[in-house]
């Protein structure tokens, strides 16, 4: 177990002075390529109770039921631990959620999104807890999925960037990525009821939908806490694209620089990131990157669309005490100047070595190297989902009749 230190009372199952029992909530999953959709699910789950425990599956279990994960289990444990709504992480959680697991961790119920998770033989992994009435559902976040992110990496296009329309080429690729050659594993046609819910023979759970950023979503993710007297304001800036372990390790080290840190992360505009990263970077647009970083427990505030050069105006406005950068290359601004010139002049610039070598480039390389495996994984996953949906509809059909 990996506890995140939210208080001994919570871990013990007590609320405090009145010794009132707290509600302990269980979530589990692969949490591979963690994005703001995962974070939003955990945020919703935490709101249903007082203490959130998250079980993460092993590489072996994921490979057996879904296909090879992008990240190792140790990387995935650490990513989930860094999400601010998580109180405790349970490594090597079983793929099928049972009452035994909930009882072992003293959890009242488990929470999952309104999509389906199936075993290798097509069974609902939450069937047992659903039948026992210890299952709760939260809304799946529209507009983001591992499928979509992998598709963006494999197809070199900038259509996902802010203020740009999705190109027909990207839409065609996104719609077909992971789509099985036949609607069902046996190649059978889908019933009219299922077909109406699954246009083009695609699962409603695996695929791409449009992400619509709202102010409410940002408010839900933000802490809303201003810097307090005695806190050290630390500023970091970058793309923070595909928010990953390398970012978490860096921010964790930054967090250790002060007894009471208040970390502000400045996120550059998509066009600025593309200037210094090239290709089709950033993989995630500014709105998506904002939510990903806001979900991190080591970040207090985010500047959306921060200037590339850290100016005197910015430092004065936020009353910044320290400015930090990792060991990645510092690319000059458009005019050739050092973007950290002002904090260096003030003597408040620190370069941090987090000890992690993982970068967004390396993640993309992992995906490209294993492209065929990931596409096959999605085809297998979607075929199982469609077969499950078809079987469910047939069970719901009136005896001796067709589904209307």
Curated annotation (Swiss-Prot):
One GO process term, biological-process aspect: phosphatidylethanolamine biosynthetic process
This enzyme's EC code(s): 2.7.7.14
Single Gene Ontology MF annotation: ethanolamine-phosphate cytidylyltransferase activity
UniProtKB keywords: Lipid biosynthesis, Lipid metabolism, Nucleotidyltransferase, Phospholipid biosynthesis, Phospholipid metabolism, Phosphoprotein, Transferase
Modified residues (Phosphoserine): 356
Binding positions for CTP per the UniProt entry: 239-240, 247-250, 277, 325-328, 354-358
InterPro entries noted in UniProt: CCT (IPR041723), Cyt_trans-like (IPR004821), Ect1/PCYT2 (IPR044608), Rossmann-like_a/b/a_fold (IPR014729)
Protein role: Ethanolamine-phosphate cytidylyltransferase that catalyzes the second step in the synthesis of phosphatidylethanolamine (PE) from ethanolamine via the CDP-ethanolamine pathway. Phosphatidylethanolamine is a dominant inner-leaflet phospholipid in cell membranes, where it plays a role in membrane function by structurally stabilizing membrane-anchored proteins, and participates in important cellular processes such as cell division, cell fusion, blood coagulation, and apoptosis.
Protein name: Ethanolamine-phosphate cytidylyltransferase
Lineage summary: Eukaryota, Metazoa, Chordata, Craniata, Vertebrata
């Amino acid at each position: 177990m990996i506890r995140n230190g939210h208080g001994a009372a919570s871990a013990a199952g007590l609320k405090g002075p009145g010794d009132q029992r707290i509600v302990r909530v269980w979530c589990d999953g692969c949490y591979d390529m963690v994005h703001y959709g995962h974070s939003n699910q955990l945020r919703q789950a935490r709101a249903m109770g007082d203490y959130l425990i998250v079980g993460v599956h092993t590489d072996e279990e994921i490979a057996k039921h879904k296909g090879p994960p992008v990240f190792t289990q140790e990387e995935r444990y650490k990513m989930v631990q860094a999400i601010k709504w998580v109180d405790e992480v349970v490594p090597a959680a079983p793929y099928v959620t049972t009452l035994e697991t909930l009882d072992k961790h003293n959890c009242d119920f488990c929470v999952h999104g309104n999509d389906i998770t199936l075993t290798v033989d097509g069974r609902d992994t939450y069937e047992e807890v659903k039948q026992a009435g210890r299952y709760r559902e939260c809304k799946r976040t529209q507009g983001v999925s591992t499928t979509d992110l992998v598709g963006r990496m494999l197809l070199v296009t900038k259509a996902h960037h802010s203020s740009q329309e999705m190109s027909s080429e990207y839409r065609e690729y996104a719609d077909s990525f992971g789509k099985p050659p036949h609607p069902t594993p046996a190649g059978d046609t889908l019933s009219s009821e299922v077909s109406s819910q699954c246009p083009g023979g695609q699962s409603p759970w695996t695929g791409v939908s449009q992400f619509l950023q709202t102010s409410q979503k940002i408010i839900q993710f933000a802490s809303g806490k201003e810097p307090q007297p005695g806190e050290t304001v630390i500023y970091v800036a970058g793309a923070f694209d595909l928010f990953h372990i390398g970012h978490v390790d860096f921010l964790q080290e930054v967090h250790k620089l002060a007894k009471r840190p208040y970390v502000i992360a400045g996120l550059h505009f998509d066009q600025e990131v593309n200037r210094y990263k090239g290709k089709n970077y950033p993989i995630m647009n500014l709105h998506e990157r904002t939510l990903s970083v806001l979900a991190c427990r080591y970040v207090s505030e985010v500047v959306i669309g921060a200037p590339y050069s850290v100016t005197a105006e910015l430092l004065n406005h936020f009353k910044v005490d320290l400015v930090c950068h990792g060991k990645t290359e510092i690319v000059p601004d458009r005019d050739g100047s050092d973007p950290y010139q002002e904090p260096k002049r003030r003597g408040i610039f620190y370069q941090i070595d987090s000890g992690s070598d993982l970068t967004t480039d390396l993640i993309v390389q992992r995906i490209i190297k294993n492209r065929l495996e990931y596409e096959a994984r999605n085809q297998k996953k979607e075929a199982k989902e469609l077969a499950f949906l078809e079987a469910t509809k047939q069970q719901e059909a009136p005896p001796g009749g067709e589904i209307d």
